[in-house]
Protein backbone atom coordinates (compact mmCIF):
# COMPACT_ATOMS: atom_id res chain seq x y z
CA UNK A 1 0.00 0.00 0.00
CA UNK A 2 1.32 3.44 -0.94
CA UNK A 3 -0.10 6.70 0.39
CA UNK A 4 1.13 10.27 -0.13
CA UNK A 5 2.19 12.99 2.24
CA UNK A 6 1.73 16.52 0.86
CA UNK A 7 3.96 19.31 2.11
CA UNK A 8 4.51 22.88 1.04
CA UNK A 9 6.69 25.71 2.23
CA UNK A 10 4.98 29.02 2.90
CA UNK A 11 7.96 31.32 2.36
CA UNK A 12 8.81 32.41 -1.15
CA UNK A 13 10.55 35.44 -2.53
CA UNK A 14 9.73 39.11 -3.04
CA UNK A 15 11.12 41.51 -5.60
CA UNK A 16 10.47 45.19 -6.22
CA UNK A 17 10.76 46.68 -9.67
CA UNK A 18 9.75 49.42 -12.02
CA UNK A 19 6.37 49.45 -13.70
CA UNK A 20 4.66 51.76 -16.16
CA UNK A 21 2.61 54.50 -14.50
CA UNK A 22 -0.62 56.04 -15.77
CA UNK A 23 -2.55 58.65 -13.78
CA UNK A 24 -0.45 57.84 -10.68
CA UNK A 25 -1.38 54.16 -10.79
CA UNK A 26 0.46 50.97 -11.75
CA UNK A 27 -0.11 50.05 -15.39
CA UNK A 28 0.91 46.42 -16.00
CA UNK A 29 -0.38 46.69 -19.58
CA UNK A 30 -3.16 44.16 -18.91
CA UNK A 31 -5.97 46.64 -19.51
CA UNK A 32 -6.32 47.60 -15.83
CA UNK A 33 -4.81 50.30 -13.61
CA UNK A 34 -4.04 49.58 -9.93
CA UNK A 35 -3.84 52.11 -7.09
CA UNK A 36 -1.16 51.91 -4.41
CA UNK A 37 -1.95 48.92 -2.19
CA UNK A 38 -4.00 47.07 -4.81
CA UNK A 39 -3.03 43.53 -5.82
CA UNK A 40 -3.38 41.54 -9.01
CA UNK A 41 -2.29 38.07 -10.02
CA UNK A 42 -0.32 36.38 -12.78
CA UNK A 43 -1.71 32.84 -12.67
CA UNK A 44 0.51 31.60 -15.49
CA UNK A 45 3.71 32.30 -13.52
CA UNK A 46 2.09 32.03 -10.05
CA UNK A 47 2.83 35.61 -8.92
CA UNK A 48 1.00 38.05 -6.66
CA UNK A 49 1.80 41.64 -7.64
CA UNK A 50 1.12 44.68 -5.46
CA UNK A 51 1.27 48.32 -6.55
CA UNK A 52 3.45 50.11 -3.96
CA UNK A 53 4.80 53.57 -3.22
CA UNK A 54 8.40 53.71 -4.39
CA UNK A 55 11.21 56.15 -3.69
CA UNK A 56 10.57 59.90 -3.96
CA UNK A 57 6.86 59.49 -4.72
CA UNK A 58 7.32 57.02 -7.53
CA UNK A 59 5.17 53.93 -8.01
CA UNK A 60 6.62 50.41 -8.18
CA UNK A 61 5.49 46.81 -8.23
CA UNK A 62 6.21 44.23 -5.54
CA UNK A 63 6.14 40.67 -6.85
CA UNK A 64 5.63 37.70 -4.51
CA UNK A 65 6.27 34.20 -5.79
CA UNK A 66 6.59 30.62 -4.62
CA UNK A 67 9.58 29.15 -2.84
CA UNK A 68 12.17 27.21 -4.80
CA UNK A 69 12.30 23.54 -3.83
CA UNK A 70 15.33 21.29 -3.74
CA UNK A 71 14.97 18.05 -5.67
CA UNK A 72 13.55 15.25 -3.52
CA UNK A 73 14.45 11.85 -4.98
CA UNK A 74 11.48 9.50 -5.19
CA UNK A 75 8.98 12.35 -4.92
CA UNK A 76 6.84 13.99 -7.58
CA UNK A 77 6.72 17.78 -8.00
CA UNK A 78 3.06 18.79 -8.34
CA UNK A 79 1.89 22.01 -10.04
CA UNK A 80 -1.67 22.50 -8.74
CA UNK A 81 -2.63 25.59 -10.78
CA UNK A 82 -4.93 28.33 -9.54
CA UNK A 83 -4.11 31.73 -8.06
CA UNK A 84 -1.13 32.55 -5.80
CA UNK A 85 -0.37 31.02 -3.31
CA UNK A 86 -2.56 28.00 -4.17
CA UNK A 87 -0.66 27.57 -7.47
CA UNK A 88 2.70 27.06 -5.72
CA UNK A 89 4.27 23.70 -6.55
CA UNK A 90 4.87 21.14 -3.84
CA UNK A 91 6.26 17.63 -3.54
CA UNK A 92 4.19 14.49 -3.09
CA UNK A 93 6.35 11.81 -1.53
CA UNK A 94 5.45 8.19 -0.88
CA UNK A 95 4.71 7.67 2.79
CA UNK A 96 6.37 4.65 4.31
CA UNK A 97 3.85 2.19 5.67
CA UNK A 98 5.20 0.15 8.55
Curated annotation (Swiss-Prot):
Entry keywords, A to Z: Disulfide bond, Secreted, Signal, Toxin
Reading the lineage from the top rank, the first entry is Eukaryota
Q: What is its main location?
A: secreted
GO MF annotation: an example? toxin activity
Pfam families assigned: SVWC
Gene Ontology CC annotation, any one = extracellular region
Its family?
Belongs to the scoloptoxin-16 family.
Q: How is it modified after translation?
A: Contains 4 disulfide bonds.
The entry's note on the tissues where this protein occurs is: Expressed by the venom gland.
Q: Which InterPro entries match?
A: SVWC_dom
Signal peptide residues are 1-24
Its localization reads: Secreted
- This chain's protein is named U-scoloptoxin(16)-Er9a
Amino acid sequence: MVSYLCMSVSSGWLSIGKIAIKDGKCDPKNGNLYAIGEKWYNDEDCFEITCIQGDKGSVAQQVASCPVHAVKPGCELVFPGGTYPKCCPYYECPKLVI
